[in-house]
Amino acid sequence: MSMRHKVGTIAGTMAVSLAFIPGTASAHSLSFNQKAAAYVKQFVGRVPYVYGGSSPSGFDCSGLTSYVYRHYGKSIPRTADAQFRRFHRESEGRAWGGDLVFFHVNSNPNSYVTHVGVYEGGHHMVAATHPGGGIRWQTIYSSNVTFGTITH
């Protein structure tokens, strides 16, 4: 067996093995996260905030997240709090771009969720902010947040 074949076999075995370790992502889920994180950016500065909005003519926060996820075949609830109740919780250190950031009314991580955005990594997110604010790429401005995933 040539050295090139041995290295390829070892690398292939490692890649296959990682797909079955809990807490690691499959190629499919990583691909979804990357796509969702990239897709949501097209709305930044181009789409207004509309309370109850769930289309590119105007979004509210949970309308934006549900629209992005639905674009890739992932059906999630329509409201921020209902989305939070459906997602698996992660620490920011384990969250990936494309996961969601949930904002709570207080420091209790089980408290009601009032806002949601798409995590972009590096303590940043894309979210529908408020009337007049539209869709923005912004720093996560609160410590009362939980990160959530349905993909890994």
Residue ranges and their predicted role:
Residues 19-21:
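Structural signal for the C-terminal ends of transmembrane alpha-helices
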Residues 2-4, 10-12, 23-41, 46-49, ...:
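Aromatic- and glycine-rich peptidoglycan recognition patches
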Residues 1-2, 81:
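General helical secondary-structure elements
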Residues 42-97:
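Catalytic cysteine-centered active-site loop
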Residues 74-135:
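...with weaker cross-activation on analogous glycine-rich loops/strands in unrelated enzymes
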